[in-house]
């Protein structure tokens, strides 16, 4: 089992990364909440990982915090929730927001995540409620993402990457394009910031 990786961030193509560890490139898929916190390509990065072994592939998922990985593991234990849906849930909602939804049995935010209808949201909340009783939503447990922009050059490429990342989460291409286009003052923003603002707009609308 690979539990953690520390190396050089070699590539970043949301929602995938490649981390170079002593000459070996590990490809990972990460939730957008982890992507927002990553350093620039070429810098050192540490991620906590979860390995999924399948007949045709070994898939590695990465997380900025251990407790994000714990949340991911809780989600994929549920019936009908695979890694893709778990990442979509964690990308659309901050970890503490998701825990609060479970504790309050609030489906309003969950149903805006691709692949989650009302019945599915209700079932997930019921199944997770007992598991999350001991979880507290506090800054000590989750490091929240800043609302500040992350500027970068090459806005057109950043926008294309943002749309591609949203589609990979399950949003329709038209929905993804519309969400990115709706962002005001987006010139110079990084793909990560465009994704963050797009998801925030779609989940909270």
Swiss-Prot record:
Pfam families the record matches: HHH_5, RuvA_C, RuvA_N
One GO CC term on file: Holliday junction helicase complex
An example Gene Ontology molecular-function term: ATP binding
Region ranges (Domain III): 154-205
Biological processes per GO annotation: DNA recombination; DNA repair
Alphabetic keyword roster: Cytoplasm, DNA damage, DNA recombination, DNA repair, DNA-binding
Family listed: Belongs to the RuvA family.
Main location (coarse class): cytoplasm
Domain comment quoted from the record: Has three domains with a flexible linker between the domains II and III and assumes an 'L' shape. Domain III is highly mobile and contacts RuvB.
Origin: domain of life: Bacteria
Region annotation Flexible linker: where it falls in the sequence: 144-153
Protein name per its UniProtKB record: Holliday junction branch migration complex subunit RuvA
Biological source species: Pseudomonas putida (strain W619)
Domain I: region residues: 1-64
InterPro entries, alphabetized: DNA_helicase_Holl-junc_RuvA_I, Hlx-hairpin-Hlx_DNA-bd_motif, NA-bd_OB-fold, RuvA, RuvA_2-like, RuvA_C, RuvA_C_sf
